[in-house]
Structure formats: structure tokens, C-alpha cells
Regions:
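Acidic, low-complexity intrinsically disordered regions
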Residues: 21-22, 95, 132
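Alpha-helix boundary/N-cap detector
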Residues: 30-37, 73, 77, 127
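Signature for HUH/AEP ssDNA processing cores
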Residues: 44-103
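Eukaryotic short linear interaction motifs
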Residues: 68-70, 106, 121-123
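Histidine-centered divalent-metal-coordination microenvironment in nucleic-acid enzymes
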Residues: 97-120
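Helical (often loop-to-helix) elements that flank the catalytic cores of nucleotide-handling enzymes
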Residues: 116-136
Length: 136
């Protein structure tokens, strides 16, 4: 068995190391596998932030919904409000983010979200996490 990601017809990987560019990342692919396209997009976003900043603050949180929605417009509105506040509060010009809507049927609809900011301007996540709760 190699340590490279194996991709099947469903564009899922089942190995424990995800190879992206020249780097390998340890991942928990689990029994259901890893969605390759979103993983690549996330790593591209992290690398873009690191190419502009020597340190990046990554804040990861879940956004839970009370009821099902047929689209993701709520994330667009959330981003607009959060980014406006973050730019005003911290004076950052570049904000990285990734999100993924959970597809499980047994649980309530929710989003996994990661916000990436210049760590030379944002030292602690407390104010941001409070604002996330307020906006959501």
C-alpha cells in the first residue's frame, strides 16, 4: 500500500495521507472516505493565505441550522456580515475561508467552517467567536 491518495470513480480517497502538490497531509479518511475536491480547495486556500502572511490564525467552528434549507444563501449573508466586521475590527485586507455543508441525514443540517486571518493582526479568536455567535 502506498501513502498516496487513491481516487476512485466517486472522487473519494481512502488513504491516511492526502498528497497535494509536493506536500503530504495526514487525514482521517474514515470508512466513508474523503471528498477530494473540497480537500484540495481547502489546502489551496491555506496555501494562498500562507503565501501572503508568515503566520495564519485558523478558527474552525460549526454553524448549526434549526431547519433544512434548499440552498446555501445563508452562508453568503453570514460571510458578508462577518467579513465587514473583521475588516473594520482588525484592519485586515485578506480573509481566507472554507466551508462544507454536512450531508448526513440523521442530524440537523449544519456547516463546518474555517476562517483564516493574518495572525500578526489577530492574536486571539475570542472576539471573533463571540461575533460569529452574534451574527449566526
Amino acid at each position: 500500500m502506498t501513502n498516496q491518495l487513491t481516487i476512485n470513480n466517486n472522487d473519494k480517497g481512502y488513504e491516511h495521507i492526502f498528497v497535494h502538490g509536493e506536500k503530504g497531509w495526514w487525514v482521517n479518511a474514515g470508512k466513508s472516505g474523503l471528498m477530494v475536491k473540497p480537500m484540495r480547495a481547502m489546502l489551496d486556500q491555506i496555501e494562498a493565505m500562507l503565501s501572503n502572511h508568515s503566520r495564519v490564525m485558523l478558527i474552525r467552528f460549526d454553524l448549526r441550522m434549526e431547519s433544512y434549507t434548499p440552498d446555501n444563501k445563508i452562508i453568503t449573508v453570514f460571510n458578508r456580515r462577518l467579513f465587514k466586521w473583521v475588516k473594520a475590527q482588525y484592519g485586515v485586507s485578506r480573509i481566507g475561508f472554507v466551508w462544507c455543508r454536512e450531508l448526513e441525514r440523521a442530524k440537523r443540517q449544519h456547516y463546518h467552517y474555517a476562517l483564516m486571518l493574518d495572525a500578526s493582526k489577530v492574536n486571539y479568536p475570542n472576539s471573533i467567536t463571540k461575533k460569529v455567535l452574534q451574527i449566526w
